[in-house]
Amino acid sequence: GDGSFGLNAMEIDTAVRHKIAVLVVISLNGGWTADPDKNKPGRELGYTRYDKMAEALGAYGAYVDKPEDIRPALEKAQKEVDKGRVAVVNVRTDYRARAGTLAFASYST
């Protein structure tokens, strides 16, 4: 998600400089989901435009805020990766959404 990406975001610079073609998809849910009730200090992260940061570093960046735009954004990003570029797709998601299909879906840190 966006919290984890924020801790390592400058690795996009490393990938661009070393021409490591990679596609990064970020779940931009605006905070740490370990606190879905938003009670803990520091939970809120805002909705950082990491796609713009990626562009500033020389990567391809896309921002998605509607479900119907996810597939086209991923397809365009993959074309950029196929050309040897780094691509970041920043997908705004609902912080309350949790994957219920995984055995550890209820796990929170």
Regions found by a protein language model. Name each.
Residues 1-109:
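Thiamine diphosphate
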